[in-house]
Regions:
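N-terminal leader/targeting pre-sequences
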Residues: 1-162
Length: 162
């Protein structure tokens, strides 16, 4: 099965996102073992150009329509295709795992695109800030990864022995 995979490997952020076909879209499985404390905006971005400081070459949020920023998949209001809400590690386990379902796209649509962890909480487009309707006022880009093509058997971070 062909999928899309993005891997985060920095001192602050470690994790991976695996995208596989699912019904009329994709299933996006995210798994993180290291994140800074607090909630962080989590979005798929349009480009995959890592040149430049702080993931700045990755452009705006990925969207197959003409939508404004909104909540996570499954929200009742219109949203960018790449709006995934917030991620946060809670408790002593120090890991975050969540699955998302995105309609109308295939794993290959994400190849070469990026996924970003932002410094601050995403206001889901509901804040009164100038950038609430475009970025969710999520702040700086503190971690980014590019989706690559994978056709091999999954070797997920969760299943590896260290």
């Amino acid at each position: 099965m062909t999928s899309a995979v993005a891997v985060f490997k920095t001192d602050e952020i470690q994790g991976e996102v695996v995208v596989t076909p699912y019904k009329s879209g994709v299933k996006l499985n995210s798994y993180f073992t290291r994140l800074p404390p607090g909630k962080h905006g989590f979005h798929i971005h349009k480009a995959g150009d890592l040149r430049g400081e702080g993931c700045m070459g990755l452009c705006e949020h990925y969207d197959i329509g003409r939508n404004t920023h909104g909540g996570k998949p499954g929200s009742t209001r219109k949203r960018h295709t790449g709006d995934l809400g917030n991620i946060e590690i809670k408790g002593k386990r120090q890991e975050f795992q969540k699955s998302y379902f995105l309609k109308g796209i295939k794993p290959k649509d994400l190849w070469g695109r990026s996924i970003i962890v932002h410094k601050d909480e995403d206001d889901l487009g509901k804040g009164g800030f100038e950038d609430s309707k475009t970025t969710g006022h999520s702040g700086a880009r503190i971690g980014c990864a590019i989706f690559g093509r994978s056709t091999c058997a999954p070797k997920t971070l969760k299943n590896r022995r260290h």
